[in-house]
Amino acid sequence: MHNSGAKEKSLVEKYPPSEPCSCEICVNYCKRPGWWTVEEAGRALDAGFGKRMMLEMAPELTFGVLSPAFKGCEGNFALNEFSENGCNFFKNSLCQLFGTGCQPLECRFCHHDRRGEGEKCHLDIEKDWNTKAGSKLIEKWIRVTGFPCASYYHMIIRSNRK
């Protein structure tokens, strides 16, 4: 029987931080930008990191996700041709967001000891973005950064939502 009075764990509770690690597997995780929750991305935006974010679109083009940008994609859509450049916050094998309170949940959680669990974390963060709160934060990011492709983004979202 389902206990309707039980509080569901927050994503931060469900996906606790891992121990820092500089092994090859973990460093490779760090090269690919991890995702913030909507709340975390809002804090990062308020902390002045908006111009270093990119807008990733869901495969079905019905919602977006703000994440640390690939080098070369800062303040733009996530473009596949820049994916090999890595995260713009990853410099000299270190994360510039580490210890700032703005490191993405997905980055804090993923670790070589948690093989296969990163995908669950990613999917749960995706659900967090496919919400009104996610859409509202993207609109704030568009205003704050002067995102040059705002009208194109709005056209994509309007034409793909049912």
Regions found by a protein language model. Name each.
Residues 1-162:
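Short loop/turn segments that flank or connect secondary-structure elements
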